[in-house]
Amino acid sequence: MNALTDADYVDVKLTAAEVLLASHVGCMRNVQSLKKATDRVEPEPRKYWQSNIIGAIGECVIAKYFNIYWSGAVGDWRAKDVGDFEVKTNEQIYKKNVLMVKKGNSPDRKYFLVAGNAFNYRIFGWVDGYDIMSEARWGDPPHNSPLD
């Protein structure tokens, strides 16, 4: 798998058990955030549950594809998502998917873009953290720039 391109993607099908496991991880992460009253950079606060669950499912997809153990870490927001990778997940496959990063994200990791729903997901590829964090890649601010 190469860096992000329009023609380079891989489809991954999760089992019901894998989706259930990842969903539980997302729920645990959300409860922990609520308990700690963590300040979050979330465009729509009512989607906290959704973003945590979808994010955990995306991590599960990458772990399955690369056959890497996924701990589903809860409580350490600085931990890497899967192995040495970070995963960004959209809940649907669009004609043009966008990999969004935050300014605080680590530039020394590879960022994978995953999209899908139910049991069917697509890995669109990856981009180097240093590359995506450079202002030249931000696109049309504020829509494609790293979030504050």
Enumerate the predicted regions with their spans:
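Nucleic-acid endonuclease domains
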Residues: M1-G83, K88-D148
